[in-house]
Amino acid sequence: FMQSIEKHDYVISIISDNYLKSRNCMYEMLEVVKDSNFSQRLLFIVLTNEDAKYYKVAPIQDIGADVYSVSGQAKYSKFWSQMDKELDSEIEEIGNSIYAINQIKEKKIIQKILLDLPDFLEFVRENKGLSLTEHLENGFADMISFMEL
């Protein structure tokens, strides 16, 4: 993923509730945001539940990413904290850390997400990604302007 981003002028990221709860998505995005060369080329579409109307098949669950409120941001911190606790339980159940190597590696990744999550959410909030509905209503003018097209 990182190598493919280097080849592009801009990266448009669609942020949904599931995205913010995906280990792979969060791990990669947190790496991208740390690199100022990449972070200056990132554009966000922050999905709201209203944006589900554009799906061909209605999503089973809410898609909206609650990144603009403190309580919404806390929801994602709690989610990743719970993942961390579940790994602690698995490691404890296994008993010997030699046999829990995969769980320990996963725990390191989850802890990295937990550590970097507040900065990422603040980055998204400061860069005010519009919803898909807002982008469609204004013809993606903000993105076009950002990319100086």
Annotate each PLM feature.
Residues F1-V11, V33-R41, N138-L149:
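Conserved N-terminal substructure of TIR/SEFIR domains
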Residues D17-N18, S39, F44-Y54:
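Short beta-alpha junction loops
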Residues D17-N37:
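Conserved TIR/SEFIR loop-to-helix hotspot centered on a Trp-containing motif
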Residues N49-L149:
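C-terminal interaction surface of TIR/SEFIR-family domains
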